[in-house]
């Protein structure tokens, strides 16, 4: 049995820390806590009213996917990961991740509630998993992995793919709006959320490195390429980014670029060997290994949380 999954009678007490790298990730998550009340969306309505019908359609569907997906991630954490993983440091991270995912879901729901005035349309968007085939396909894939009989390692990769690949193209599409100077509330919340998801993805990679018997490279590649195909179809066929003026082929390449970055972080060879086609995505938090403590998004960090004097903690650890 994997040591991180083995019964641990000390799991109810945090100290003494046994896994400093995992604990450090938890402290990073704690330092980046935020709430929806801190995001000003009052100026978005003027921009929203100026968008074309295609642009509105695209944003509404992306928000509908996001609003549902965080709940799926949380269900996996509650039903599987939090009960399987026996080391306290990881349980701290997963517990905090659940709180953050709730904030993300609330943020997306609030954005839908603010932009969409028709109550029937709101209900349609809030129930996207049932009402939208393109969203249902992604949700079904993620939910399948919650209940899969595969080992923790495989399911860890699947949910790294959900947070690292299924979200990537949609994040990029919203950053595209930022590049155009539109929707400041939506784009700022997107910065915060994409940074959080980058950290969650980094954490999955860290947990993977703690496995003594990880899934094979072939298995990892299969899961990741499957997720890439679904995400590419989502943003180039079902909900094409050309609706907001983006290039569909470049979006396909970007999703492959993100997948390569993920599989490299897991310690395997790249699959696609492509470069990032979107210059405006070079510095966002899905880059992994983010430096958001030195220069946090919106100059925003809980004061003092990371000011550790204990020599065991290092911000230079190569995750």
Curated annotation (Swiss-Prot):
Function: Ribonucleoside-diphosphate reductase holoenzyme provides the precursors necessary for viral DNA synthesis. Allows virus growth in non-dividing cells. Catalyzes the biosynthesis of deoxyribonucleotides from the corresponding ribonucleotides.
UniProt keyword Transmembrane helix present: no
GO molecular function terms listed in the Swiss-Prot or TrEMBL record: metal ion binding; ribonucleoside-diphosphate reductase activity, thioredoxin disulfide as acceptor
Name of protein: Ribonucleoside-diphosphate reductase small chain
UniProt EC number: 1.17.4.1
Class of enzymatic activity (EC top level): oxidoreductase
Family from the record: Belongs to the ribonucleoside diphosphate reductase small chain family.
Cofactor note: Binds 2 iron ions per subunit.
Active site (UniProt): 108
Keyword Oxidoreductase: yes
Cofactors that this protein relies on: Fe cation
Alphabetized UniProt keyword annotations: Deoxyribonucleotide synthesis, Early protein, Iron, Metal-binding, Oxidoreductase
Induction: Expressed in the early phase of the viral replicative cycle.
Entry binding sites for Fe cation 1: 70, 101, 104
Gene3D superfamilies to which the protein is assigned, alphabetical: Ribonucleotide Reductase, subunit A
One Gene Ontology term from the biological process aspect of the record: deoxyribonucleotide biosynthetic process
Effect seen on changing residue 300 to F: Partial loss of viral DNA synthesis
Subunit structure: Interacts with RNR1/OPG080 subunit. Can interact with host RNR1 supunit.
Catalytic activity, reaction form: a 2'-deoxyribonucleoside 5'-diphosphate + [thioredoxin]-disulfide + H2O = a ribonucleoside 5'-diphosphate + [thioredoxin]-dithiol
Gene source species: Vaccinia virus (strain Western Reserve)
Binding site for Fe cation 2: 101, 163, 197, 200
Region entry Interaction with R1, spans: 313-319
Top-level taxonomy: Viruses, Varidnaviria, Bamfordvirae, Nucleocytoviricota, Pokkesviricetes
